A protein has these predicted regions:
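Residues that define the transmembrane beta-barrel architecture of outer-membrane proteins
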Residues: 198, 227-231, 262-266, 304-308, ...
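Periplasmic polypeptide-binding modules associated with outer-membrane biogenesis and secretion
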Residues: 18-222, 252-264, 423
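Repeated loop/turn-to-beta-strand initiation elements of outer-membrane beta-barrel proteins
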Residues: 188, 212-214, 241-247, 275-281, ...
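Transmembrane beta-barrel strands of outer-membrane/channel proteins
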Residues: 192, 216-220, 247-253, 281-287, ...
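Residue-level signature of outer-membrane beta-barrel architecture
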Residues: 237-239, 272, 314-316, 360-362, ...
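Transmembrane beta-barrel wall of Gram-negative outer-membrane proteins
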Residues: 258-360
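C-terminal outer-membrane beta-barrel translocator/porin domains of Gram-negative envelope proteins
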Residues: 338, 343-483, 489-491, 529-531, ...
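Outer-membrane beta-barrel "beta-signal"
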Residues: 235, 507-516, 533-545
Length: 545
């Protein structure tokens, strides 16, 4: 096979399938683009669970003070006792100021607001009169004395580490609930129970489902050569290590053939909470095999990819309507691509990368917004592919990526309309391996063209859906219209930019036990010398258990 590079050079650049010109490298690129999306999908599932469990919190209105007495009380000043978490002096009445019920109520509200601004929610006040002409305002700052639960899945040393004896902070409590509710089979709430001497018991209640939940389904997202249809399944395990952790297992396989043309994948995602920290590990194996028809015979191409990652997230800011995270990730990818059993080096990178980023989730009264910005650097560690020279894929690279996801719900009379938008942008001056390029076409980008893969280092895609939500008992039905636009340009100085446009009509049906989506889409790719157009019908169905 030493003459294989010459053989490949002599092959036609395009082979015809379903009257559509498909590049010889198309299946390699398509496979690697699908592989890299698996970790991103797990992260999006976690974010979606957060939105499902939270509603926008309206700011509290001030109490009506019309009935409070304006008569001055016989006190010359106020002394504060028991204040350690805030400084009460900036709120103290001025010397010789009239102290009446109205003024004391204003003082109580101001001090309560100061506590709440820092997240401290249980700090009862008491006024004491020692007949000295001074009014004592005593606060009992609530501290956690006991943690209890009806569930063995809740490990408080992981959810609320080192919390006993410390002041109760709503941010710590919300963080613990978010971490606990990442377990798919758990729905955790908490009761705050005052005890003696200002102590507080936190009683956690878990409406448990089975520790094992999951889904089984079918879709036609696989490539045309593997027969489109693939079976998929997932298993979610609550608390497998006793650390209030979560384990997700996913598998998929094309239905048409087990030995000839196929796509298959296996992946896991594991998260361990520790207060404001989350440690995640991810691993996947994906493989494909495809026979490419030529004019007089066919050739075989195949490939597989191993992927593993460790990630740490830290929540550095949160309130009732938002949460902000910093994260860092170390990733290892080893990909092999073969043409007629010979290794294609340019399509077989071994990569070690480190990624840092910031993520923000925001709730509004009418919807939500997710923003994510990240930087990724390719390293030389562990025999990673080295830079081969000019115009060759580089193992050491810099990659910037941004993503915004916006959802809004508009009530118009008795109807509800749903808008969802997703903007993805990537930039790199390096020649990136295919698995690190961003896709312009397909299920995660401009819809409609499923059998023609186009990816590049510089890329921006905007996806939009606008639908009508109809609720009937436990059913939610959403017919929708979609429109996508995108543009990309490779790093090569003589590369032309490419643009794509797509539109879609679809129907989503959601039930607590199952989900179904059917979508018809048309996509157009605008290249320098031609316009590629394709229509597709995508179906996705799964049942949950």
């Amino acid at each position: 096979m030493k003459h294989l590079p010459i053989l490949i050079a002599c092959l036609p650049m395009f082979t015809w399938a379903n009257e559509q010109p498909i590049s010889i490298q198309n299946e390699f690129n398509r496979f690697q683009q699908q592989t890299k999306k698996q970790n991103e999908q797990f992260q999006q599932v976690q974010q979606q669970r957060w939105f499902e469990q939270h509603q926008y919190q309206v700011e509290q209105q001030e109490n009506d003070q019309a009935d409070l007495s304006q008569v001055c009380l016989p006190y010359s000043e106020i002394q504060f006792v028991g204040f350690h978490l805030i400084d009460p002096l900036p709120f103290a009445p001025k010397k010789n100021e009239c102290l009446n019920e109205d003024r004391l109520n204003q003082l109580s509200q101001a001090l309560t607001a100061a506590y709440l601004a820092l997240g401290y929610i249980y700090n009862p006040f008491q006024f004491e009169d020692d007949h000295s002409g001074k009014l004592t305002m005593r606060v009992t700052e609530g501290r956690i004395s006991q943690l209890s639960s009806n569930s063995h899945r809740l490990n408080f040393s992981m959810l609320l580490p080192n919390s006993l004896g410390k002041p109760l902070n709503i941010k710590d409590l919300d963080q613990a609930l978010d971490q606990a509710n990442k377990m798919p089979g758990s729905k955790v709430s908490v009761d705050v129970l005052p005890a003696k001497n200002g102590e507080i018991e936190l009683a956690f209640v878990n409406e448990e489902k089975s520790r094992l939940t999951g889904y089984l389904g079918l879709d036609n997202f696989a490539s045309k050569r593997s027969g489109r249809w693939q079976a998929k399944g997932g298993l979610n395990i609550d608390n497998p290590l006793g650390l209030s952790d979560s384990l997700y297992l996913n598998v998929s396989h094309s239905l048409k053939s087990y030995h000839h043309n196929f796509n298959r994948s296996l992946s896991f995602f594991h998260t361990i909470p520790y207060g404001y920290w989350t440690l995640s590990s991810f691993g996947s194996f994906s493989a494909f095999k495809s026979n490419v028809p030529l004019q007089h015979h066919s050739v075989e191409q195949k490939g597989h990819t191993w992927q593993a990652a460790l990630r740490g997230d830290y929540t550095f800011r949160r309130d009732s309507n938002s949460i902000s995270n910093l994260y860092a990730q170390l990733e290892r990818i080893k990909s092999k691509s073969y043409f007629q059993d010979s290794l294609i080096l340019l399509q077989s990178p071994t990569l070690t990368t480190v990624q840092i980023g910031v993520n923000h989730l925001q709730l509004f009264s009418y919807g939500s917004l997710i923003t994510d910005f990240s930087y990724e650097r390719g390293l030389r560690w562990w025999n990673a592919t080295l830079n081969q020279g000019q115009d060759q894929p580089e193992g050491q690279f810099n990659r910037w990526r941004a993503e915004l996801q916006f959802n809004a719900f508009y009530p118009i009379k008795s109807q509800t309309f749903h808008q969802s938008s997703r903007l993805i942008g990537q930039y790199s001056r390096n020649y990136l391996p295919a698995i690190k390029q961003e896709e312009l076409l397909g299920r995660y980008a401009v819809r409609g063209i499923n059998d023609f893969s186009q990816s590049a280092e510089k890329n921006i895609v905007l996806r939009n859906n606008f639908g009508w939500l109809y609720q009937y008992k436990q059913w939610q039905i959403e017919p929708y219209l979609g429109m996508d636009i995108g543009m990309q340009k490779a790093t090569s100085p003589d590369a032309d930019s490419q643009k794509a446009f797509g539109y879609a009509v679809g129907l989503k049906t959601t039930h607590p036990a199952w989900y179904m989506q059917l979508e018809w889409a048309t996509g157009r790719l605008f290249q320098r010398n031609q316009i590629v157009q394709e229509r597709s019908i995508n179906a996705n169905w799964y049942v949950m258990f």
